[in-house]
Amino acid sequence: MENFRKVRSEEAPAGDGDEGGSPSSGPFADLAPGAVHMRVKEGSKIRNLLAFATASMAQPATRAIVFSGCGRATTKTVTCAEILKRRLAGLHQVTRLRYRSVREVWQSLPPGPTPGQTPSDPAASLSVLKNVPSLAILLSKDALDPRQLGYQPPNLSPGPSSPPTVSTSKRSLGESAAGEGTAKRSQPEPEAENEDRTA
C-alpha cells in the first residue's frame, strides 16, 4: 500500500445482520427521544465533548446520553464516559460492543516524473471494506435494567472532591523512589573519573 494514499473513509450502510438495526437507532433502540448522542471521532477534543455533555446533562429534561465511537476513537469514548461519570454522580451505565463496516477509498500515487514521458492514465483507486470495533456507552440518570448485558450500577465511591486515600501512599512511595534515584545520580561513576584524569 506504499503506492497508495487514503482519500476518504466512510461508514458503510448497515445490513440486515447488523446488531443494532439502522445506524440512526444505534445499539440502544429503546431510548427516550430526548437522549443526547455524542459521536466521538479520532480527532475530537475531549474538553469540547465534555463541555457539551456536561451542559446537556445539567438540564433536567435530559435524562440520558450516549457516547459512541469506532476504530481508534474507542479509547477516547471510554475516557469521555468515565470523566462524565466522575463529574455527575449516580449515573447508570450500559456498554455495548459491536463491529461496524467502514469503507476506505485509496488512490494510487502517480509515478515519479521521467524525462520525455507524459501522464496518460488517471490515478487508479482502490476500495477496501473493513470491520472495525465500535463502542457505545449509555449513561442514564434513571435506573436501568440490571439484568441486561453490559450494565454497571452507579459508582458509590467518593468523588474527586474528597481527599484520596490510596493516592497518598503511592505518592509517598514515589517520592522515596525519586530520592534514591537522585542520590544514585549524584555519585560519580568510576569510568567518568578515569576519563577526566586522562583528559
UniProtKB/Swiss-Prot annotation:
Ranges in a coiled coil: none
Compositional bias annotation for Acidic residues: 190-199
Pfam families membership: Alba
Phosphoserine: residues carrying this PTM: 172
An annotated Gene Ontology molecular function: ribonuclease P RNA binding
Domain of life: Eukaryota
Keyword list, A-Z: Nucleus, Phosphoprotein, RNA-binding, rRNA processing, tRNA processing
Main subcellular location of this protein, as a coarse class: nucleus
Keyword Manganese: no
Compartment(s): Nucleus, Nucleolus
One GO term describing the cellular component: nucleolus
GO BP, one annotated term: tRNA 5'-leader removal
Region of interest called Disordered, as start-end residue ranges on this chain: 1-31, 146-199
Basic and acidic residues composition bias: residue spans: 1-11
Similarity field: Belongs to the histone-like Alba family.
Function: Component of ribonuclease P, a ribonucleoprotein complex that generates mature tRNA molecules by cleaving their 5'-ends. Also a component of the MRP ribonuclease complex, which cleaves pre-rRNA sequences.
Quaternary state and interactors: Component of nuclear RNase P and RNase MRP ribonucleoproteins. RNase P consists of a catalytic RNA moiety and 10 different protein chains; POP1, POP4, POP5, POP7, RPP14, RPP21, RPP25, RPP30, RPP38 and RPP40. Within the RNase P complex, POP1, POP7 and RPP25 form the 'finger' subcomplex, POP5, RPP14, RPP40 and homodimeric RPP30 form the 'palm' subcomplex, and RPP21, POP4 and RPP38 form the 'wrist' subcomplex. All subunits of the RNase P complex interact with the catalytic RNA. Several subunits of RNase P are also part of the RNase MRP complex.
Name by which UniProt lists this protein: Ribonuclease P protein subunit p25
Source organism phylogeny: Eukaryota, Metazoa, Chordata, Craniata, Vertebrata
